[in-house]
Structures are given as structure tokens and as C-alpha cells.
Amino acid sequence: EPVRVPTLCLGELVARHGCPGFLKIDIEGADEAVLADLGRLAVRPATVSWETGKESLRGVLRQHRRLAALGYGRFRVVQQAYLECAPPALGPNGSHWSFEPGCSGPLPELSPQPWKSLSWVSGQYALLFLAYGLVGPRSWFRAAARHPSRWIGGVPRRIQRWAERRRLPLPGWVDSQAQLL
């Protein structure tokens, strides 16, 4: 049975609590609405992180161009699958810690990944969408790997095991990060 909960738009949250320095958006399919609301804010978060979809390269690039038009000029592509394979990171207090499967990784200011231009990130997404088509979650490769036949599913399963042994994850979901200039 549906459960109704009260909601607020981004502008109302900022009016009540002030503008955050870092905004993490993860609303399963509604991230685009929050990105659109950023344009209505008089003061914007210095850094924004959101989950990008796997359905449309055009849609992902449109999100990045929208943020660039709002003054965000530095970007990152954070491939979540690599976080689980990364060596332990240093926490804010200097201690070592690892990311659990499914996490979004470190806060942007603690990330070792360099910030890049919009054109660089656009190229990365073009390559990523090519990889999605070849070996991504909805690809023929993943479908074949699930096939019970030794002949149809065997080769993709062997390739997956080979990649896992070398800690080379197949493309999974991705977060984008943007920083105001």
C-alpha cells in the first residue's frame, strides 16, 4: 500500500536551512528535477554530486551543460564499481578505511580524482556509453553470461571471472560531480 510523505523542493529546503556547501542528489530517477531547481537558487552549493542514468548519453550531457551554464566549471565522473576495488582511502582523521559495495565514495574534497573540464567529461561519458552497450548491465554480453548453456554463456562468464581476478570491474552505475568556479 502506498505511503504518503510530505516533500519539499530544493528552494524550500535552502530557505529553511541555508545553502549547503555540498549537495548529494540520489532520488532514483528524479535527480533531474533537483538539478533543474538549482537554477532557481540565488546561492548555489559549491559542489554537487548526482547519479547519472544509463539510458541516454544526450540526457547525461544535457545535465552537465545545465550545470556549466549555472557556473559549475569543473567535473568528475565517479565510476562506482571502481570504488569497491580501490585501495583503502585516508579518512579525514588520517585513518584508513574502505568503501562498502554500493557506496558513493569519499566526499569530493577527499577524492584523489582530479577535476576535469566539461569537454573531457563529455568524452568520458561517450566512451562509457559505448562500454554500456558492449558489456554493461543491459548488454548482450551480460545476457549471454546469464545463459545456462556452456556454449553461449561460457565465454562471457570466463571473461567476467578474468576481469574480477584482475579487479577490473565491468561498467556499473556512475555519479557525476560538479564544482562552482
Q: Where on the chain are the PLM-derived regions?
A:
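Conserved acidic-Pro-Pro-aromatic motif
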Residues: 12-181
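S-adenosyl-L-methionine
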Residues: 1-14
